[in-house]
């Protein structure tokens, strides 16, 4: 019988590359070698043969992990092939209703329907509940880190225009600051975090303008132009290094996707990544629901995956279908696997397609000390039991 230590290192790396997000923590406890290799994966030292897009999706106020492989979109015989799976997360997060979620460098910020905040590191299995400084009916949040890799939460207080708060995970404290804005932030979730900064879509006389919040300087930049003005726009990102914008024309069947070649707090340069006329969209009177970050791209394959909600044609049914589509050049549109159903009143959100595990400790020092003490007691009890058995 083949034992774990009989496996070659290349085979182990390939196995680790296929481990679901929510199971990474269990790998660490298998053996010291696997723990070390899993850390290599986190530090991007190990490159699997097949590149999987991993991320999270929210529907019906429940968080789900998502795994998508489009590196094998076509088999050698020309037959189309896509490996897609969505899995419910069976931990404490499915015991609460989640209205929004935000991702940054392997850390998730979840907002419950009763406006409680919880930070989660899926790899380490650590959580932290965060007490709000100011109680309001509605708020918009985002999660990012500064140049020193200190994670921070930016909160927009909707009851006071121009009022914001910042939570520092290192100091466990909120700070308030006021800005006199000439714009309003779009509160429908349209933002993307790249290189330590977050770019928001603004609501102004000119639609689709962007503005950056610098988490190191803790200030907003100037208004930035996207590569287009009119139509429906959704934002995404690539490896937290490039900003991506999907633009859907209002009066034609054209879909455009642009990607940044230069990205700074006060300057953006764009290049066209994909442009296609999808005639069947007009024929079907169909438009992608892109109110949220629900698409991602594969630069190598020059394809985009869009997650979309389609309302049921049966008026007696309250559910809508969540579908996935692959779009490419020359009008290529392919409907892929169904991702299940969701309540009509809430749109599914595609959070991130480039999840990378993190070793950042997010639980508080007291909880960490108690955990170490429990582990130490278990080891001591096990050692004494082993000694007694030998006697």
Swiss-Prot record:
Coiled coil: none annotated. Transmembrane segments: none annotated. Residues 369-391 are annotated as: Disordered. SMART domains: FBOX. Kelch repeats lie at residues 100-143, 144-194. Keywords: Kelch repeat, Repeat. This is F-box/kelch-repeat protein At4g05080. It comes from Arabidopsis thaliana.
């Amino acid at each position: 019988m083949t034992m774990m230590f009989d496996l070659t290192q290349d085979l182990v790396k390939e196995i680790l590359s296929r481990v679901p997000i929510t199971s990474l923590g269990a790998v660490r406890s298998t053996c010291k070698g696997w723990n070390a290799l899993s850390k290599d994966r986190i530090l991007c030292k190990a490159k699997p043969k097949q590149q999987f897009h991993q991320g999270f999706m929210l529907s019906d106020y429940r968080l789900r992990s998502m795994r998508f492989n489009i590196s094998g979109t076509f088999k050698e015989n020309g037959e189309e092939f896509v490996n897609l799976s969505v899995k419910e997360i069976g931990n404490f997060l499915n015991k609460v209703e989640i209205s929004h979620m935000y991702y940054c460098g392997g850390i998730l910020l979840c907002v419950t329907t009763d406006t409680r905040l919880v930070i989660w590191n899926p790899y380490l299995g650590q959580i932290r509940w965060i007490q709000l400084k100011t109680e309001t009916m509605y708020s918009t949040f985002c999660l990012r880190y500064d140049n020193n890799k200190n994670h921070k939460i930016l909160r927009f207080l909707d009851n006071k225009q121009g009022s914001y708060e910042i939570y520092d995970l290192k100091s466990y404290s909120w700070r308030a600051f006021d800005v006199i804005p000439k714009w309003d932030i779009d509160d429908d979730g349209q933002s993307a975090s790249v290189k330590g900064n977050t770019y928001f879509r603004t609501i102004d006389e000119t639609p689709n303008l962007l503005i950056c919040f610098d988490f190191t300087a803790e200030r907003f930049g100037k208004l930035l132009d996207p590569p287009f003005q009119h139509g429906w726009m959704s934002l995404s990102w690539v490896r937290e290094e490039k900003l991506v914008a999907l633009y859907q024309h209002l009066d034609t069947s054209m879909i455009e996707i642009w990607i940044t070649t230069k990205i700074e707090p006060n300057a953006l340069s764009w290049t066209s990544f994909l442009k296609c006329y999808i005639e069947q969209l007009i024929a079907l009177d169909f438009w992608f629901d892109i109110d949220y970050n629900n698409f991602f791209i594969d630069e190598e394959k020059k394809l985009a995956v869009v997650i979309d909600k389609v309302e049921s044609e049966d008026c007696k049914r309250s559910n809508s279908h969540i579908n996935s589509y692959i779009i490419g050049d020359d009008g290529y549109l392919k409907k892929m696997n169904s991702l299940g159903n969701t309540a009509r009143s809430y749109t599914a959100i595609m959070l991130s397609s480039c999840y990378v595990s993190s070793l950042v400790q997010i639980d508080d020092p007291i909880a960490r000390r108690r955990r170490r003490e429990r582990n130490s007691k278990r080891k001591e009890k096990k050692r004494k039991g082993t000694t007694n058995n030998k006697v």
